[in-house]
Each structure stands twice: as structure tokens, then as C-alpha cells.
Amino acid sequence: MTRANARELAVHLIYGREFTGEEPEQVVSIRLAKEYYAKLSQENDIYSERPSRAQTAYIDKVVSGVANRAEELNAEIQKYSIGWDVSRISRLTRSLMQLAIYEILFVEDVPTGVAVSEAVRLAKKYDGDDTGSFVNGILGTFARSLQYRISWNCYYSLYIIMRLLIAIR
């Protein structure tokens, strides 16, 4: 199973939690159990290959992370979805964007561009081309603003250090 497939599987689990309200650990352990997984493989090709231990750890990390930070992630989506209320965005699209923003902020080995392009690819696959454009717009704006926030924080930190060094002299 590729990382892209593991990401898609994680989206399925995040989306499923929207309906069940189950604890993230419970969702991952139940849905990835051998017996349950075998049933799912008959319904969707994404389940044809079981995830490795590393992929299972990634899936567990992102599903739990998105669940634990849902309010924060939704606030970021809301900030950049001008003219749209988060509650009006389809649950699947919201799940895709939550995962992408979580990956950008908290998963170090996932480049920002990969998180955005994978979310767009999955949005097009499940919700159509228009949704892919919508997701690309929101996540692209989020990523650019994040770069600005990071550079400003670095600049400000450097400024404080310089002021302290001057004060010490």
C-alpha cells in the first residue's frame, strides 16, 4: 500500500467518524482489523492491500490528530473559505481539508505541496472537479498564509534576540 492509499484510507476513517462519533483509536482498530478489512476489500479497491505497520501508525496518528484538533482545523478552514460556512461544506470535503491541514501543521515528513495536491486529487475523485478547485483555493491560501506567519515569527524572534544582545552590552 502506498502513502497515497494510506492517506485515502485515513480520509475514509475521518469521514466515517463524522457519522459514528466513535473514538479515533476505536475506529482505527475496528476498521483495520483483519476480518472487517476483508469485508471492505469487496466494496472498494483501496482496501485490497492491508497497510504496513508504518502506514497503520500514520493512519492512527492522523485520524487521532484530526479528531483531537477538529475545532482548530475547522477554524482554519473557516478562515479561508470566504462566503462559505464550514457547516455547509460537505463532510467528505471537510474531512479532506482537515487531514491536509493537519498534515501540513503536524506531520513533518509530508511536504505542504503533497498534502495539498493529494487533498485536491481526492476531492476530484469523490466530489468532482469543482470541489477540487474549491479545496485547492482554500488549502493554497492557507499554505501561503502559513509561510507568511512562519517568516514573520522568525523575523520577530530575531528582532527580540538582537534587542537582548544590545541591552546586554
Task: Label each residue range with its predicted role.
Residues 1-169:
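N-terminal interaction/assembly modules
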